[in-house]
Amino acid sequence: MNSPDPAALRASRRKLLLIMLVFAAPIVAAMLLTFAGWQPSGKANGLAVMPQRNFAAEQVPVSLTNGDTWAWRAKEPQLTLIALAGPGCAKQCMDVLTKMAAARLTLNQNAPRLRLLYVGKPPADAAATGMTNYWKLGQDSMGALAPFAPTTPDSVNALLVESDGTALSFYPAGFDPTGLRKDLQKVIR
């Protein structure tokens, strides 16, 4: 029987170690970066809601115009996009609300996975403009959503809420509806 060549044996071991290193290096690098506290920056257009809020756990009641109370946890997994209007929702406010509803439509077959909720005093011409075709209208009787409402007249803030009632992203007045649409397309697939 032939004895293995020591040089060939060392070369085989080096190749095996090199292959193991190729697969282990990214894992080790990720662990080092995580322990150092580095996290990749996201490209979301909305702001993170800090401290995290769960409206279902807090039992935030939103009274709908038909007398029902908004169910934060839907029967099927559905996110909720809440529009919170400032005082005197008029032309600019309605324009943003229309763009938000259009962002839902761009989700195509995933559009039913997003619910639209308008909280606050509805515009005077809400029914005439067809707003009620897309938005559920409600009131925050306890003022639990007041910290998210704008104070600027004729403006809208938006809040994206997960299907379990956890507030995910906040979009302050003057936000870009196109950025909101992009975020929705990332989250709802």
Q: Whereabouts are the PLM-identified features?
A:
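Thiol-/selenol-based redox modules, centered on thioredoxin-like
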Residues: 154, 160-189
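Short active-site neighborhood of thiol/selenol oxidoreductases, capturing the structured segment around
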Residues: 72-100
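Hydrophobic membrane-insertion alpha-helices, especially the h-region
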Residues: 14-36
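N-terminal "domain-start" segment that seeds a small globular fold
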Residues: 25-28, 38-73, 95
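N-terminal Lys/Arg-rich, disordered targeting/topogenic segments
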Residues: 1-10
